């Protein structure tokens, strides 16, 4: 009896929403979710939930955007200004940078609308409404006898429902997403704006202060923000870039608070979290640790060492490789922290105890036992059957698909539709040719050789693609000689060579190029490996769905939130510090004093290098209306809001729906947060909006932007 009680308690902690600050909540369910509404009000919320989200009236959610499909942002002016993170705008800033105009290093400040810089591939997405379409989707799959048949039926009806939206209104995009491991389905209707221009970017000494050293760490002093503007046609509708476009006028503008926060202040985030695996089985967690996470750690570590060495040597390479290095290293360090936290916080052990209780519940309920008696044995066997190959696939993807850029170019060429409409072919070819702008062949050759060696050292020889046999037979096993020959003989190592190559009479000549031929071999091997585990993968997909549904039935009175899936979510909690380990306590905010301390502590370290004029400005202490109650300048703060990747740039609002700052990171001690919420440790790191405005007005001398903003009362 004592054991069963202990197990039940642990299970509750692992799988149910028992913490007020846990959860990424669906906006469409807010009105019906009385428990969440009650808890938010108890924590201090001072606005009704229909002011947060209402598909029929302007509301707070109307100011929140998906930024490029990979980050979040918030609209803060009647003329379409958008605040997001510096690291979210980093790729756009990099694309506009050169050695002569180094906006990464020095920042960018548009003095007028005419100086704002277009970004052809960037868009923002507004959520208009959501709709539960579960019954319609599941009805279409009711006759499916296998997981494959179910998936085909579900995918088909999801596409039909999505297309119905754009058929009625070409300016809208409909997307049906799966929730609760495929047990529920919701339609989200969006409107996209494709003309988004760069307005303001602080220097990287502000926006990336601390760089890799401080990434995922607290305390933090990173001014992680950038400013863009949405443009529309003269009717305020979506339009591709045109000089004739005008600033977009939004449905709702987020007001800004200069009052700050204190310990215990209510705080909520609205944004687009990417993905979590809170309900994943222990078998899935173990596979994640030893598969994709470990592959990222090993392979990206090798690749990034080569990139960083050359970036530190040459300014042109630093600019070319800045964005891709930043993206790669972010997930690399995340994987390191996640695996470490899973072990340190005993996530697997807790999950297994929870699963033991679920087994007991199934055994004690005849109707459940009949359906799920083999659930755990099937999951365990299926994960075991694909373990070795799945691990090899993880290393394959990191080493080749995400490895040398010559291979990535070749794969794009193989997938290029030369028979498409001429205008589309020209546009896509232009994008393909632009990739050469950020490619250095000597670096890429070194990366390719390193990837070949790394992959070979990590997998069984049965997983080696055909090129390894070629290296052995034609190049005496010398990988470097093979790589040198490949780059010397391929036509696609330069834009001119690619153009000449593609001007031939037929696309069948494509495979004559050694790089394209190699990539075709890689596709064949990748397909072969995936096919060998397709049955196990189908059984896992079904098993995880049944596992998820069983958990929800077991705790039918609980309020379960679905895993993140890049749809808009609300999370809420309070501002507050935490105790990372015994004997240490971290405060809930940082100030500019911490910048000076780190600059001194890390003297000579480029991660903490700051322009003298910025240090002089900060040391003056003249913070004006942006100062805190003590006359100092807050830089960052933390709350126990529940966030993940994709939440970067999410608006952090106070109890009245006024902007306090932007979420930009999580903390190192709780890096397993995508799998399990740790209430005592997990924190959302945000940049204080007052620091952002100070940098915009005083350092960027852009008071005209401040005048556009709507300040809270």
Language-model features and meaning:
Residues 17-713:
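Terminal presequence/propeptide segments associated with secretion/organelle targeting
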Residues 1-22:
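Bacterial Sec-dependent N-terminal signal peptides
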């Amino acid at each position: 009896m004592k054991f069963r009680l202990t197990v039940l308690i642990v299970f509750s902690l692992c799988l149910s929403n028992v913490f007020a600050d846990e959860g990424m909540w669906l906006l469409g369910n807010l009105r019906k979710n009385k428990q969440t509404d009650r808890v938010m009000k108890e924590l201090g919320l001072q606005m009704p939930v229909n002011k947060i989200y209402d598909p029929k009236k302007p509301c707070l959610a109307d100011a929140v955007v998906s930024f490029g499909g990979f980050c979040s942002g918030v609209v803060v002016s009647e003329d379409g200004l958008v605040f997001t993170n510096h690291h979210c705008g980093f790729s756009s800033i990099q694309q506009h940078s050169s050695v002569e105009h180094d906006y990464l290093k020095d920042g960018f400040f548009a003095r007028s609308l005419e100086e704002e810089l277009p970004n052809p591939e960037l868009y923002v997405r507004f959520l208009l409404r959501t709709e539960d379409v579960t019954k319609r989707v599941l009805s279409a799959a009711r006759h499916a006898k296998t997981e494959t048949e179910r998936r085909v039926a579900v995918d088909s009806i999801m596409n039909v429902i999505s297309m119905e939206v754009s058929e009625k209104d070409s300016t809208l995009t409909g997307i049906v997403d799966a929730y609760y491991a495929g047990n529920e389905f919701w339609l989200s209707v969006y409107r996209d704006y494709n003309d988004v221009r760069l307005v303001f970017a602080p220097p990287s000494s502000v926006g990336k202060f601390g760089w890799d050293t401080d990434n995922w760490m607290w305390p933090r002093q990173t001014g992680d923000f950038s400013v863009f503007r949405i443009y529309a046609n003269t009717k305020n509708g979506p339009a591709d870039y045109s000089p004739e476009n005008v600033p977009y006028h939004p449905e709702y503008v987020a007001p800004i608070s200069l009052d700050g926060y204190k310990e215990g202040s209510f705080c909520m985030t609205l944004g687009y979290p990417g993905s979590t695996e809170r309900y994943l089985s222990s078998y899935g967690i173990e596979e994640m640790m030893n598969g994709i996470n470990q592959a990222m750690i090993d392979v990206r570590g090798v690749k990034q060492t080569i990139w960083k060495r050359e970036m530190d040597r040459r300014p042109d390479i630093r600019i070319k490789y800045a964005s891709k290095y930043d993206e790669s290293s972010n997930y690399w360090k995340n994987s390191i922290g996640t695996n470490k936290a899973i072990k340190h916080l005993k996530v697997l052990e807790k999950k297994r105890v929870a699963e033991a209780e679920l087994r007991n519940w199934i055994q004690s309920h005849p109707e459940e036992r009949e359906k799920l008696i083999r659930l755990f044995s099937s999951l365990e066997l299926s994960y075991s059957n694909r373990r070795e190959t799945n691990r090899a696939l993880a290393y394959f993807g990191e080493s080749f698909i995400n490895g040398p850029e010559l291979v990535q170019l070749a794969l794009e060429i193989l997938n290029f539709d030369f028979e498409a409409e001429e205008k589309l072919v020209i546009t896509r070819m232009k994008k393909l040719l632009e990739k050469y702008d950020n490619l250095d062949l000597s670096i890429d050759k070194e990366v390719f050789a390193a990837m070949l060696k790394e992959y070979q050292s990590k997998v069984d020889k049965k997983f080696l693609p055909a090129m390894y046999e070629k290296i052995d037979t034609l190049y005496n096993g010398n990988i470097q000689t093979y790589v040198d020959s490949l780059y010397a003989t391929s036509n696609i190592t330069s834009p001119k060579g690619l153009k000449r190559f593609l001007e031939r009479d037929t696309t069948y000549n494509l495979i004559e190029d050694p790089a394209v031929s190699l990539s075709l071999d890689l596709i064949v091997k990748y397909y072969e490996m995936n096919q060998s585990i397709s049955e196990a993968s189908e059984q896992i997909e079904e098993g995880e769905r049944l596992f998820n549904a069983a958990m929800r039935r077991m705790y039918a009175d609980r309020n379960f939130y679905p895993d993140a899936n890049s749809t808009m979510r609300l999370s809420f909690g309070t501002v507050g510090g935490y105790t990372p380990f015994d004997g240490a306590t971290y405060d809930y905010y940082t100030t500019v004093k911490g910048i000076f301390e780190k600059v001194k502590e890390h003297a000579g370290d480029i991660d903490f290098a700051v322009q003298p004029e910025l240090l002089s400005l900060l040391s003056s202490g003249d913070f004006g209306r942006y100062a805190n109650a003590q006359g100092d300048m807050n830089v960052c703060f933390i709350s126990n809001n529940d966030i993940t990747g994709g939440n970067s740039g999410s608006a952090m609002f106070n109890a009245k729906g006024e902007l306090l700052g932007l979420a930009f990171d999580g903390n190192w001690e709780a890096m397993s947060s995508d799998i399990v919420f740790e209430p005592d440790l997990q924190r959302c790191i945000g940049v204080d909006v007052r620091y952002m405005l100070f940098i915009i007005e005083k350092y960027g001398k852009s008071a005209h932007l401040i005048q556009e903003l709507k300040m809270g009362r």
